[in-house]
């Protein structure tokens, strides 16, 4: 049971003040493969470019908005999926992906405009944040 679940059971919840900062020096803690994926995503975010990758046997094109870490310590990306379909049949929309499960992550070299998306930066769906647009 996570800390948040335990607090909920006990009736105690901390007031959410937003995500904590993760430090880029910590990227290597995820291992060589995941660190390389994180760096590719961060590079694309520097220029507001889409990324493409394979996830659950499906190709996805995503506008990355947040790269961070879950409360369980998993590297995550939150982004808007503009192309591709999930196993559940969902098409375009906001998604959270575990970076270690992403395959063949590359920069799509196509730009996107952050203002075209309804992004709530107060609640990025990560515990710690490496980068957020």
Task: Give the positions of each predicted feature.
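Short glycine- and basic-residue-enriched patches
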Residues: 1-133
């Amino acid at each position: 049971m996570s800390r948040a679940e335990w607090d909920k059971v006990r009736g105690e919840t901390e007031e959410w003040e937003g995500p904590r900062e993760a430090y880029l020096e910590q990227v290597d803690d995820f291992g060589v493969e995941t660190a390389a994926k994180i760096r590719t995503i961060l590079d694309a975010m520097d220029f507001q470019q889409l990324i493409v990758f394979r996830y659950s046997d499906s190709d996805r094109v995503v506008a990355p908005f947040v790269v961070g870490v879950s409360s369980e310590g998993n590297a995550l990306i939150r982004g808007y999926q503009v192309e591709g379909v999930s196993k559940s049949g969902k098409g375009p929309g906001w998604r959270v992906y575990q970076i270690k499960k992403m395959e063949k992550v590359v920069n799509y070299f196509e730009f996107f405009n952050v203002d075209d998306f309804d992004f709530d930066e107060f609640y990025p769906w990560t515990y710690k944040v490496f980068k957020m647009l």
